[in-house]
Every structure is written in structure tokens, then in C-alpha cells.
Amino acid sequence: MSRYPRFLYRYGTLNANNIDRVRDVIVRSELWLSSPADFNDPFDTAAHVTFDGSVDEMRAWLLAREGAVVGLTPEQKAQRREEMLANPQRLTATVLATFRKHLDAAGVACFTLDPRHLLMWSHYAASHAGIAFQFEPTRCLDTITYAVPVQYSEEYPIVDWLRDPFGGLRATMLRKNPVWSYERESRIFEPNGARSYLPFAPAGLTDIILGCRASAATEQALRQLLAERSALSHPAVKVYRARMHPWAYKVTLSTT
């Protein structure tokens, strides 16, 4: 049994305003990595950050980060360090700001397991007028196989910023409230990758699904992008159409 899901999906829109972003995926084989600062849910990436340790441990943590401080002499840096240790509120504010800075600098690409979910089509694919990309992770061993399932919990993750900052960032990226569990989300998390592109193997994109409300213009734009892809000799991508089921609240998928 494979350790990876057979397929992962990304919902999106396709119109004149974002055709270049769709071209990035279909033609250039690149995924846009968003910053958590751009997420629509302010609770997404919320965390309970702790910074507990001995004075010597906290002093060592501050000392290790003083290389990024410019314009101060070694003596001034030492004074600043000791003043911060003597002021817990100031130290806490610095730790939280550092955590948020690293968090917002991380790049995130989101996927789901379900290409037929009515809410996903409504919320992320222009009210069923958009598209959904299908990826096969085993064809992208250096990228999409790194997608990790999100954990759903009522509690924020606890981040030990003193001893395990990277683990804390990762846990924060992969924790959401259970109200979002219907998304069955997986995420790729790239430190310092916010608002940049992540290349993937062209063979990893296998299918594209048109929403049940996708217009003829949307389908024409998609066909044009697929022609650009074909001109680069990339593997062919199948196109499907989502259709409203005649007597049940669900969509069916069929080839176009």
C-alpha cells in the first residue's frame, strides 16, 4: 500500500484576471506558495507560543540571533540582551514577533483529497464556475509527496519556541479547527518560501476538472493553455466536466 494518496486536488478559478496563475500550473509546472498572512481565516496558524527555560538558555537564544542586529556595538548588544532578560513582557513580545515573522515567511500550498465536494467547489472554484487540478503525488517525488495532512483540533498547537522552533512552525501550519475538517486538507510547507513558486514535475498534473457552471469561455481558455502545454511536449492532461446529479446533492465527473 502506498504511503501517499493516489491523487491530490487544488480548486481554483480561471478567468481573465488570473489566467497567468493558471498558466503557471498547466504550462510552467509551478505552484504558487502563499503566505499565512494572506489566509482568509485569522485562526489559521494561530498557536500558543511558549518560551520557558533557564536564564542561561534564554540568554543563549538571544545571543544566537544578535548577528541580525546592525548598528550596535558588542557592548550595546550585551546591554540590550540583559535588559530584555530583565523585562519578561519585552522578551515575550520579541519572541511572538519572531515567531510571526518566520510563520509569515513560510510558503504554503494547499490540497484536498476530494474532487466532488460541493462546498469546495462553491468556496474555492468560483461557485462551481472554476476548475480543479488533479495531481498524482508519486509522479512528483520531490514536491507533492511532501504534502502532509492537516490535523483538526479544538486547541491551538503548543509551540516551544526555545527548543523546537521549526517543529513548532510545522505543527502550526498543520493544525486547524474541526469546522474545516470537511476540506480533508493536506499542505506543503516551505520555510522562507512565501509568495514564491515551487516547481513540480510536469507529469504530476494528470487531470483538470471543469466545474458544472464553467462557461464555454472558461473551457476555451483551458484548451488554449493545454495547447501551450502540448507545445512544450509535456505529458497530456485529461479534461473532465463536473455535472449536477439529476436526483441527488452531488456532482458526477465525465470526460468532455
Question: Which stretches of residues belong to each language-model region?
Answer:
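Partner-binding and oligomerization surfaces adjacent to conserved cores of proteins
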Residues: M1-T256
